Amino acid sequence: MIKLSIVIPTLKEEGYIEGTVRQFERLSISHEIIVSDGGSDDKTVEIARTLTEKVTVLSDGKPTPSKQRNAGAALATGEFLCFTDSSVRIPDIEKFFERAFAKFDADHELVAITGPQNIFPEIETFWDRLFLGIQNSLIRFQNNVLGRGVGTGKFMLMHRNAFLQIDGFDVGLIAGEDLDLYRRLAFVGKTRYMPDQAILYPGRREHGLGWPKLLWIWTTNVIWIWIFGHTWIKEWKPVR
């Protein structure tokens, strides 16, 4: 059995997808790359098909990250699932996954992990460091102290059996599906935030919308999901 299935949802990512996929060429652990596209009208799919045999394209006209991730996971054969975004970079990728799997080997109750998420250092601002520092601390506290599963879509690593046990992502959620997934995973095992499992990303939404607006959207969506079971926003638009 393949050790790791890496699922990458895409939508108009022709500028990032090649670099994102090729970084896994430095990973010696047996793995497969699955690109799940939401109907890109640029060269994303064309590029992806030169990099991996497993590319799926959603054609229902209303792609969401949850639908794309579930579609990718349906093609997976690995013992573990890694969901990451199409613009994420993982520093020292070989040691990154060696550390991750060592944690699963050491604790058989562990079903999923996540870690710090930081913006590329060359474009990171003071406000990025402040608000992401707070976010990372909150995710750590909720997972490691309260035992309440919380994860974000930029990096999620889990046992595939646990993912299947809870029927994957809730396709009824337009956003916040990553938080919901880890919340449910915590009912079947441990979820943990690992400080040494940091990833980097370009912060396009943070810089494109600005932190005040983004924090308002995030907070409102979380409250709406808790109270009403669905998101406040009706569409999660990509920022490119």
What do these predicted ranges mean?
Residues 12-26:
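Short, well-formed alpha-helical segments that are part of the catalytic scaffolds
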Residues 30-39, 58:
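Short beta-strand/loop segment that forms part of the nucleotide-sugar
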Residues 37-45, 88:
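A conserved acidic beta->alpha catalytic loop
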Residues 60-76:
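Glycine-rich, basic loop-to-helix element that forms the pyrophosphate-binding segment
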Residues 81:
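Short aromatic/hydrophobic "clamp" motif used to bind/position activated sugar donors
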Residues 92-126:
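Conserved donor NDP-sugar-binding/catalytic core segment of glycosyltransferases
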Residues 119-126, 139-158:
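A recurrent flexible, glycine/aromatic-enriched loop bordering the glycosyltransferase active site
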Residues 175-181:
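Acidic donor-binding loop at a coil-to-helix junction in glycosyltransferase catalytic cores
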